[in-house]
Design a protein with these regions (language model features):
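N-terminal export/targeting leaders of redox proteins
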Residues: 1-25, 106
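Electrostatic cytochrome c docking/interface patches
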Residues: 16-36, 69
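Solvent-exposed, acidic/flexible segments
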Residues: 28, 63, 67, 86-93
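Cys/His-enriched microdomains
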Residues: 39
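Surface-exposed patches in mature extracellular/periplasmic domains of secreted proteins
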Residues: 43, 84-85
Length: 106
């Protein structure tokens, strides 16, 4: 019986981590749209999920920033990157942070 429970648990974990698509949530979709179309982050940043391969800004796949770092950087800017707090809503900033964090982590 314990062996069956263990196998059941392994199957559930496998389904959650490998079979459920990352892109299924609305925040992810909004963040991807902001990344590609509204803030046009792909102009400067490399992110595999977005199909962007720019060399101007940091490669987000390599640095894998956490959500708070992305939110802060998008809102306030850093270095030559402009601030977007006047162009994006708080929801869009959170969504693009979620998208970058989720995509770069995979």
């Amino acid at each position: 019986m314990r062996k069956n429970n263990f196998y059941f648990l392994v199957v559930i974990i496998f389904i959650n981590f490998f079979l459920l698509p990352v892109q299924s949530d609305d925040m992810f979709d909004l963040g991807k749209d902001v990344f590609l179309n509204k803030a046009v982050c792909s102009t400067c940043h490399t992110l595999a999920d977005a199909g962007s391969n720019s060399q101007i800004g940091p490669n987000l796949n390599e640095i894998r920033p956490d959500k708070m770092t992305v939110m802060n950087t998008v809102a306030n800017g850093i270095g030559v990157m402009p601030a977007y707090e006047d162009q994006l809503t708080p929801e869009e900033i959170e969504a693009v942070a979620h998208y970058v964090f989720t995509s770069a982590a995979n």
